[in-house]
Structures are given as C-alpha cells and as structure tokens.
Amino acid sequence: RFSVRANVKEISFDQSSRAALQAGIDKLADAVGLTLGPRGRNVVLDEFGSPKVVNDGVTIARAIELPDAMENAGAALIREVASKTNDSAGDGTTTASVLAREIIKHGLLSVTSGANPVSLKRGIDKTVQALIEELEKRARPVKGGSDIKAVATISAGNDELVGTMIADAIDKVGPDGVLSIESSSSFETTVEVEEGMEIDRGYISPQFVTNPEKLLVEFENARVLITDQKITAIKDIIPILEKTTQLRAPLLIIAEDVTGEALATLVVNKLRGVLNVVAVKAPGFGERRKAMLQDIAILTGAEYQALDMGLLVENTTIDQLGIARKVTISKDSTTLIADAASKDELQARISQLKKELSETDSVYDSEKLAERIAKLAGGVAVIKVGAATETELEDRKLRIEDAKNATFAAIEEGIVPGGGATLVHLSTVIPAIKEKLEDADERLGADIVQKALVAPAALIAQNAGIEGEVVVEKIMFSEWEIGYNAMTDTYENLLEAGVIDPAKVTRCALQNAASVAGMVLTTQAIVVDKPKPKAPTAAPPQGLMV
C-alpha cells in the first residue's frame, strides 16, 4: 500500500503562539513602514542579479521570508494584507500593513488580559463597517485634471512629472481607458496614446502588404468581414469580393483562418491589382475569441458571422459588413479605427463588460476585461519608463504603477485628505459608534480601531523627523480637510494643497487590515514544520596539506 508521511510538526499554543505571530508581524511591518510618507526611506532588496532599491510596500512585503517558521507565519499574514490591498486598490499597501499591525498589537494585549477574542473581532468589524459608511459620505468626487495630477503625484512619491504624465494620459484615453507601463530604451519617460482597437494578430501572408517600405497593410474606409469560420474555398467569398470591388472599397477579412485555394486566389488577385484585400486570423481562443470578435463587430457595425448561429460566410451580404475608417496591419498586430455604427450598442457593450469586471475574482480575467473595455472606448496609453540604471528603472516603474492604480481608484470612489489625516479624523467618530455597541468586549474592539487609526499619520510624521503624537493631537482637533503636510512641514487644507488619497485606497486598507487582524485575534495555536537538524559537517583532513 502506497502512503505518504507528513513532515514532523511543531505546535505552539496560547500566549507563546501569539507572541511568535506578533514578532513576525512587527519585523515585516517595521520594514514596510519605513517607506511611508513623502519623507519615507528606501529599502534595498538583495535579489538575483543586482540589488533592488524600492519604496513600494507590497514589493518589500513579498520579498521577506523570516528564518523562524512561527514568526514567518505572522509575516505571511501582513504579506496577505499588502497583497489583498494591492489587488483591490493598487496602492495603500504600507498603510494597510501599519493598520493591521496596530490592530493586532492592541488586540492581542486585550486577549491576554482576558477579553473574548470573538467579541473583540465582532466589535472591530462593526466599527470598521460604520467608518466605511462615514468615509463614503465624506469622499469628494474627482474634479478635473488637477485632482488627478495631485493623486498621481502623491502616489508616485511626490514626482510631479509622473503626476502630469498620468493626468495627460487619462485626459486622452478617458476614465475607461487603459494605461500600460513598459520599459523605454532611452533615459526619457514618455507617453504614447494608441488610437483605435488593436488586436494581436497580423496579416496571414506578407503578399497582402500595401506599404513595402514599412511592411504594413494600410487601408482607408475598408469593409470588414468578421467570422469564426475557416475559409478554404474561394467560392464562399466571391459574392462579397465582387461587391466590394464594385464599390472600390478595400476588404479586411477577420476569420478563424484563410487557407488553401481561398488564400492563394486572394494573394494572386491582390498582386495583379484586381483585389484590394487582406486576411487576418481571429484573436484569442475559445470563448474569449468569440467575445473579441463580437467587440470588433460592434465597433465596426458589422454582423458577426457565427457558425453556431447558422450564419454562413457564403450567405453574407454587403450590408452585413462593417466599416473601418482606418486599418493598419503589421506582421503581428492589427489596428482598427472606426466610428461606431451604433453608439447605444457600443455603450451597452461597455456597460456589460464593466458589470463582468466588477463580478470577477480572477486577476487575469480582470486585466483582459479592462483591456477590452479600453479598446472599445478607444483608449490605450503606453507610458514608456526610462532611467539611467536598471535599479532606478525598476523603482520608477513601481512608483508609476502605484500612481496609475491610485488615479483610477480616485476616479472610481472619490478623494479624501491624504497624509493619514482622514484616518485620524475618522477616529473622532468612534465614540459615537461605541454608544451603539452593547457588549463590553465589542466596545473594546472599537477602542482598538481608534488607537490603530492614528498610527499611519504618526509614522508619516516620524519618518519626517517630527514627533508623531504631537502631529496626531493637532490633526484631531482640526477641520476634516486639515492635516499635516510632511513635505512642507505645515498644517494646511490638504485638499487645496494637493495632498490627496483615493477613498477606495483608504477603504481597502482599513477593510483588509481589520479582516486579517480578526483572524489573528481568534488564533489559539500555530502548526509549522519542525526544522530539520543540520547534518554535521565533515572534519577537515588532518596532517600535511600539499
């Protein structure tokens, strides 16, 4: 009988298990917390190749593995907070890590003093839910490019150039657009906006090329045939070819494949100048291919000739073809610029994709859906990041990625004062929330959240060389918009000064910190692999060495 034996485990209970978790959490949160605020420090990560200098919370969290297995379990929980916040909001990972550490620290003290962990967790959850409702009421919608620039600048570590670049890019591609970040071959950081819909398939044969110098097919006002069928017999498409030739319109065929007699005939007639045609393979695979072909059909006003709906290519009429104002095709990509035949249909399609995007849990599906929305909305901007060294390039790309995510989060749920001020102001609402809680331990949970909320603002001040408690005290007794600007060392209206955080980032940081803290507080034991004893090293040989 085949059997697998599990590794020997080490089990720790009660206070010793909680102390080990706390030690691991503290180590990771200390390393991540160094980067918080405009005067936060960098962390050097010794990775394969040259060391990496980073200022990004989630990157640091993911790089840390502690030698002690029990402490590493605690560190893994903070990694989880950072990753979850990064996935849902794209920024605020350091704030989430600091909040989680504080809630866990004060919570474990209460548990050790005899509080009921389940009631504590319930109190924390109720308090956080009430704070999120308050946050949603207080958030202000983004007004124009100046707000977008301020959000991006703060998130990129006060890099105004990045802020301006992202504001310009979003202005061009719109809120439904996609910003992609690539490495540049030069020292310059530039923005390029790609108009129209791009699909990652090029011409089937280079014989279709109309611009031999650039090896491109370039058409204007082309008719577009879209099908998921394979075209092998020329007789299937002769009626369409005759009609488009009479109209003197170029024809773009997007099909599963064009092969054999059909391809040979198209190429020969193209070279003779009889036909102005190009064939491209359909992008994607399976269900995604069908969805992308439907997107192209809606954009160009074509009727998608789907085999499973009984729409055969040989029966296609000229009215079922779409129109593309401009078509540019290289050996591996096709760009279509079209004026959507039906704006209502296009908007309905975009709304449907947005609904799918909000419901999916898959990161891969989210990226693909966002890409499809952007292509339909007609906006893809590429930020090409340049730097003098590989180390600087990596750091810059991470900052720009944070800025991009923060900007879209701000457009989605609005903005609040930055610099940790929002969390300090929210802490003043907690006494009113506590009054609605009847259980003593639940009220203790509310107190724990209140103490934790001031930690990010205190740490931002501390990283700037100022006494954190003094700063928190001043913010607490100020108006909602007033906070501490660590960059200029002044107390001012942060919304006017451009020190802004997206409300979504603050919300996700608070929710994820409370979620993981609740799990830690209700933990009573840790089970980890027992470290294997090291094999004794061989003694050096005795006697004369030659």
From Swiss-Prot:
Record Pfam families: Cpn60_TCP1
MF (Gene Ontology): ATP binding; ATP-dependent protein folding chaperone
Keyword annotations from UniProtKB, A to Z: ATP-binding, Chaperone, Chloroplast, Nucleotide-binding, Phosphoprotein, Plastid, Transit peptide
Residues with Phosphoserine modification: S50
DNA-binding keyword on record: no
Keyword Transit peptide: yes
UniProt GO cellular component terms: chloroplast
Superkingdom of source: Eukaryota
Main location: plastid
InterPro entries, per database record: Chaperonin_Cpn60_CS, Cpn60/GroEL, Cpn60/GroEL/TCP-1, GroEL-like_apical_dom_sf, GROEL-like_equatorial_sf, TCP-1-like_intermed_sf
Presequence extent in this chain: 1-6
One GO process term, biological-process aspect: protein refolding
Subcellular location per the Swiss-Prot or TrEMBL entry: Plastid, Chloroplast
Quaternary structure note: Oligomer of probably six alpha and six beta subunits.
Record function comment: This protein binds RuBisCO small and large subunits and is implicated in the assembly of the enzyme oligomer.
Other facts: This protein shows ATPase activity.
Similarity annotation: Belongs to the chaperonin (HSP60) family.
Name of the protein this chain belongs to: RuBisCO large subunit-binding protein subunit alpha, chloroplastic
Species for this entry: Brassica napus
